[in-house]
Amino acid sequence: MTICALTGKPLQTPIYQSQGSLSVTSLSQTYEGKTVVYFNEEIGHIQTKEIENIDVYYDKQYKFFNQSDEDDILYKVVDGKKIFRQEHQVNTLLSKINFEDEMQVLDYGCAKGTVMKRLGLQKPSVETYLFDVSQMYVNLWEQFLPSDHYASYQTKEEWHEKFDVVTSFFAFEHTPDPVKELRNINTLLKDGGHFYCIVPNVFENTGDFIVADHVHHYSDASLRYLFAKAGFETVEIDVSSHFGAYIAIGKKVSQKSLEFQINSIDLANVVNAAQETANYWNTLQDKICQFEQSVSGQKAAIYGAGVYGSFIATCLNNLDDIQCFIDQNPLLHGTTTFNKSIIPNSELPTEIKVIYVGLNPKIAQQVVSGFPKWQETVSSILFL
């Protein structure tokens, strides 16, 4: 039986199960096993069954572009300029939090620690600290912080009520027990301190729904519920400053749970959105397979080497027709996925006649409209 990590109550029938034996992770890698997703209608929270040995996975196997502190995920392209995710995260953080001299900030679930490194460069009077559940990134941390400013596995005892701000960038979707983690963060903050958190918005970036290693898919309602349960007053939940994500800011007001009443209209909207998302993914694999049959034997490519493109690859019965993946992220060019080369769009071979577009459906049409070359050479395009 699967238990809701936020309420402690049993979750009943799944709203989604992947059809094949392979699932996709948030790093666009494959995972042997099914993705099983549940929905708690009481608080509007989507929860995925944990992968096996999840603690070991994050300690030893979850390698978030850890070769260097420069590797990153492409966030968006504006007027031809590539903007990367961690760059955008720092700029958004600075627009939301007023960092004063000698403030102390901890990044909880920091991975490479790049956000705090960049924050320290822009705000050298702010003291930065790091915590993660792995030691894989220590070689990067020690390049810019002394050893008493970072910790792995457990936070330091001397950090009790030390921090003015605790941040968490795309970590709380991974943790099996977010209530436990946020209560621990409560003990690390000074009274009145702020928790600044970014998590995926599954209703804007629907690909988050099917990744095997994201245990939690929050809504506005379930974020407010989580904050209240850990003694935080919700200051803001912003759905627009970071595409496909919630920016949630809470203020520590108590060490105990707070009373919280979910708005019934907001909850009804979340229920409808969750059902629509589940229906979409429950039918998508059949759509991909039908398209594959209709273009069988033609040379094809998958546009997008991220979650959506990887999902397409796991659905195909035969990858022989796939010649390559196309992606705009220059950090991926020259690498491979599913034993296929990842190339820039400018190098698309003219013999490619079929393209599977592995992008967020909300932006896919707009992105592809900027590729006039496709109209000349490509005969069949699948949008998810």
Where do the model's predicted regions map?
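Conserved S-adenosyl-L-methionine
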Residues: 14-18, 232-243
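A short helix->loop->beta-strand "cap" motif at the edges of active sites that frequently abuts
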Residues: 125-126, 193, 375-379
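Conserved SAM-binding loop
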Residues: 130, 174, 197
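Short catalytic micro-motifs in class I SAM-dependent methyltransferases
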Residues: 169-176
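A short glycine-rich, Lys/Arg-flanked "PGG" loop and its adjoining helix->strand segment in the class I
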Residues: 179-194
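Hydrophobic, well-ordered beta-alpha structural blocks that scaffold small-molecule cofactor pockets
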Residues: 251-384
